[in-house]
C-alpha cells in the first residue's frame, strides 16, 4: 500500500501490429518480445493478462487510491471488441470500485472523419477514448 494513484494507458491489444486502414501509415509496435502484452493475439488472453496486472496494481495502491485507465474500443474486420467495458468488468472482479467513466473527445487529435471501410462496408471512425476511473476499496 504505497501509492495514491496509478494512471496508465495499456496497449490496445495487438492493434499496433495491424495494418492501419484510416491513414495508411506504417505499423509501429512496441517490441517483438513474447511477453509484450501488445503481441498477445487472443483477446480473452489479453484481458486475462491485464486483469493479472491490475491485481498487482490493486495490491500496491493505498486504500481509497485511484486507478485511471485510458483505453479505446477495437474493431478488427467484422468483429467489435468493447475493450473499455471488458476491462471495467475485469477490474471490478479484482476488487476495484468502478467510480466513473470519462469519454475523451479526440477529434481534434485525429482530425479524420472519413468513413472507414469505404467502399466495402461503412464504418464510423472512432474519435474518442475512455478514461476508466476506479478506486481501491
Predicted segment positions?
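Class I S-adenosyl-L-methionine-dependent methyltransferase catalytic core
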Residues: 1-137
Amino acid at each position: 500500500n504505497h501509492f495514491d494513484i496509478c494512471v496508465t494507458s495499456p496497449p490496445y491489444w495487438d492493434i499496433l501490429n495491424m495494418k492501419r486502414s484510416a491513414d495508411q501509415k506504417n505499423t509501429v509496435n512496441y517490441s517483438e518480445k513474447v511477453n509484450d502484452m501488445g503481441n498477445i493475439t487472443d483477446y480473452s488472453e489479453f484481458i486475462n493478462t491485464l486483469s493479472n496486472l491490475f491485481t498487482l496494481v490493486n495490491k500496491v495502491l493505498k486504500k481509497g487510491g485511484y486507478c485511471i485507465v485510458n483505453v479505446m474500443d477495437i474493431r478488427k474486420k467484422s468483429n467489435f471488441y468493447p475493450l473499455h467495458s471488458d476491462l471495467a468488468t475485469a477490474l471490478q472482479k479484482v476488487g476495484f470500485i468502478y467510480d466513473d467513466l470519462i469519454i475523451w473527445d479526440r477529434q481534434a487529435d485525429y482530425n479524420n472523419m472519413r468513413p472507414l471501410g469505404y467502399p466495402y462496408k461503412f464504418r464510423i471512425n472512432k474519435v474518442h477514448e475512455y478514461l476508466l476511473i476506479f478506486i481501491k476499496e
